[in-house]
Amino acid sequence: MTEFIPPGSLFHALSSPFAMKRGGQLHHARIAYETWGRLNAGATNAILIMPGLSPNAHAAHHDSNAEPGWWESMLGPGKPIDTDRWFVICVNSLGSCKGSTGPASYNPITQAMYRLDFPALSIEDGANAAIEVVHALGIKQLASLIGNSMGGMTALAILLLHPDIARSHINISGSAQALPFSIAIRSLQREAIRLDPHWKQGHYDDTHYPESGLRIARKLGVITYRSALEWDGRFGRVRLDSDQTNDTPFGLEFQIENYLESHAHRFVHTFDPNCYLYLSRSMDWFDVAEYANGDIIAGLARIRIQRALAIGSHTDILFPIQQQQQIAEGLRRGGTHATFLGLDSPQGHDAFLVDIAGFGPPVKEFLDEL
């Protein structure tokens, strides 16, 4: 499977060798990123966005890529993250297949695809790689560091590993460690991929591709990204029309089933299964408590920033609202002026992507006050 790189992507060559937290190193690796706005003369107006597991760095359209990005309504001139004021960077995570080096990339040493020879990936590796991009752009300190979902974990790792790198932080639907429920879901997703007979210990190709496994993994993910409240409102128990069903025993019958099938079918042709495995496991491993002898609040208190906003949705079952509350509590313990905000968005974990009316104003207010 090839990589899926958006047009207009920029690339930073990582230091070589690039050491990985859990052992191993990368040679001649790179990070894909995109930028919006203009960096001021003092390089004091920069914002770094760290995305979730599956997005690329194309958060919004720009001159080199007119396609709408995954956070189009949040980022741009006059929008909550106002590019008339801020110079915004979005980095594609190390280990992804959207431009940054990952299992789907070619190893320059062996001239073969990394596949499972890619070193074990940690959230901290993505954090260190992202900061190389920031420094390469001539930025010593970010005005703000924004992380959502997995990116919220990466942002916390950045703040722990690189003190004074940011003056403020917005953590959106993120967490300081993976909870058992989230680990269990991701374990099932990985199992679905690995049990697909076409996975072949990571040695699949376009002809023999673990599509069924990745499709099931994505369906499991989508179920947890939204909420039962939204599923009820959007689909209820509505059945498919007769021309949308077939005679397959136990086949698709309800609209919700058809939605999951269509969504997953689109996804499997835009993401590499091995990259999914690596990024998924990196989230399970991340734990701020490791930085303070098992005390997660003490670990968060080690972070030194001026201001922070932790925001999430009460209907999020993957990164429950108490995890954002915990982030704010821990940061306050360390002296940060931290605010927690829980929203009643029905869209669950994905609310930050679609409920811009709910998430946009507090983000804008926070940034306007910097």
From Swiss-Prot:
- Residues reported to bind substrate: 218, 350
State where the protein is found.
Answer: Cytoplasm
Q: Does the record bear Transferase in its keywords?
A: yes
Q: Per UniProt, which keywords does this protein have?
A: Acyltransferase, Amino-acid biosynthesis, Cysteine biosynthesis, Cytoplasm, Transferase
Q: Where is the AB hydrolase-1 domain?
A: 45-354
Task: List the pathway annotation.
Answer: Amino-acid biosynthesis; L-cysteine biosynthesis; L-cysteine from L-serine: step 1/2
Quote the SUPFAM superfamilies the UniProt record gives: alpha/beta-Hydrolases (SSF53474)
InterPro entries in the record, alphabetically?
Answer: AB_hydrolase_1, AB_hydrolase_fold, HAT_MetX-like
Q: Key word RNA-binding present in the record?
A: no
GO cellular component terms, alphabetically, are:
cytoplasm
Active-site residue numbers: 149, 316, 349
Please name the top-level EC class of this enzyme: transferase
A GO molecular-function annotation: homoserine O-acetyltransferase activity
Region feature (Important for substrate specificity): 52-55
- EC number(s) of the enzyme? 2.3.1.-
Q: Which GO terms describe its biological process?
A: cysteine biosynthetic process from serine; homoserine metabolic process; methionine biosynthetic process
Q: Where is this site: Important for acyl-CoA specificity?
A: 186
One Pfam family, please name it: Abhydrolase_1
Provide the reaction this enzyme catalyses: succinyl-CoA + L-serine = O-succinyl-L-serine + CoA
* Quaternary structure and interacting proteins, as annotated: Homodimer.
Its function?
A: Transfers a succinyl group from succinyl-CoA to L-serine, forming succinyl-L-serine.
UniProt record similarity statement: Belongs to the AB hydrolase superfamily. MetX family.
Can you say what this protein is called? Answer: Serine O-succinyltransferase
Origin species:
Xylella fastidiosa (strain Temecula1 / ATCC 700964)
Give the encoding gene's name: metX
